[in-house]
Structures are given as structure tokens and as C-alpha cells.
Amino acid sequence: MARFSGKVMLISGGARGQGAVEARLLVAEGARVILGDVLEAEGAALASELGPAAQFFKLDVTKEADWARAVAAAEALGPLTGLVNNAGIYVPKLMMETDAALFERHTSVNQLGCFLGMKAVVPTMERAGGGSIVNISSTAGLRGSARAFAYGATKWALRGMTKSAALELAPRGIRVNSVHPGPIATPMLDIRTPEENAARLTSVPMGRQGTAEEVARLVLFLLSDESSYMTGSELAIDGGATL
């Protein structure tokens, strides 16, 4: 039997990149998936590609009402047992180049959005008998990131939120773990020049970018019962960059 047969998963930032790869793998393993994103055309196209096992809902992760609608849609399909907090923004700037508006934009999407998502799914996961939440952080949440000050601050916050939520939710049968990707070939990094990406790889012992599928397979492991004794963990998938 497929690992996720009969289960429902909710992915924020699910319209493209890493979220889309996660959705494809989950559907292939029997899950029904709610794709949440602000990218309506891309999200609708992906849902159409995946067929009846996937639905797209416009989800602005900074709005509680959007989360409530997405969770209700997921619960209508069956027991919601998995959430991937994948939505995020990345605008690399030094601290002295970062204004308050840019900092608040990062905290709203990357940090507040994650909090609202976790809070929204807890009641339905409890009704389902438990579940798994995977928060997508970054290696910027494991070490300093001078050139991406606001982004790094929010990814450190996700790391701490994950551990605190794991402590609170373990008695309710809900596991919470964080994934910390290094340089991954996704649309988020398209803002960098090829030269910038090549320079970054000099600090990666494995000498290459990771793929969205490599990260997605780790996410599926954390969503599955194969990781049933893991909570509060922070897993780097970075080619050795944080060694």
C-alpha cells in the first residue's frame, strides 16, 4: 500500500518549485493534496496536472481566514494528517540595506505564516488522531547570514518555533520538525546570477546544488509514519555546507 493512501496533506507555497515537487510525490504515493499559494495561475495548472487527487486554494499565509478556508477544504477530503509550511520569500540584503518594511515583509510571510499554519491545523489533526508538521527553514537558520539579514532572522525563528511547538503538541499526537535546505535549484534562487550561484558552491563540500526532489523526499519521510519517533528535529540537507 502507498505510504499516504487515504491521507490528506496541505502544502503552503505549493504552486511551484519545491512545494510542487512535494505535491507530485505525495499524490504518487496515494495522498490527496491541497495546494495553497498566492500564485493562482500556476497553482490551478498544477492541480489540473495532478488530477482529482489535488485541489488548489488561494492561500495568503499571513491571513488567518485563508488558512481556515484551506483547512476546511482539506478536512472535507478526509483526515488531514500533514502540513508542509513551505511558503516563503527571500530578498537578500545586508542589515544596513534592510528597511523596516522589508524586514516586516519577511517576518509576515516566513514567520507569522508558519505560526498561523501550525495553529490552524492542530484541531483537525487532533480529530484525525495525530499528524505531522514540517516547517521549511534553511541553512540560514543554522548559522549567520550577513547578506540575507531579514531572511536569516526568520529562518532562525522557524527553528525555535518548531522546537517549542514540538514540545506543546507531542501530547496531542502531533509531531513538528524542521528542514534546513542549503543551495537548492528552485525559482527562489533565480534572482542570483550564475556567477553568484557558482561562488556559493565553493563552500559546499559536495560541490553542487541540491534538487527540489531531494528535499521533497526528506519532507515525505517526516510526513510519514517512518519518522514516527521524531519530533523537534532540525535536519540539514545542504551537501555538507554547515559542517
Predicted regions and their residues:
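Active-site helix of classical SDR
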Residues: 118, 154, 162
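Residue(s) in the substrate-gating loop at a strand-loop-helix junction
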Residues: 138
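Short, small/polar-rich loop/turn modules that mediate ligand/substrate recognition or access, typified
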Residues: 170, 175, 230-232
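C-terminal substrate-recognition "lid" of short-chain dehydrogenase/reductases
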Residues: 115, 208-237, 242
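Substrate-binding pocket helix/loop in short-chain dehydrogenase/reductase
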Residues: 94-95, 99-104, 189, 197-200
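Alpha-helical segment proximal to the catalytic Tyr-Lys
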Residues: 123, 167-168, 228
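Canonical Rossmann dinucleotide-binding motif of NAD(H)/NADP(H)-dependent dehydrogenases/reductases
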Residues: 2-34
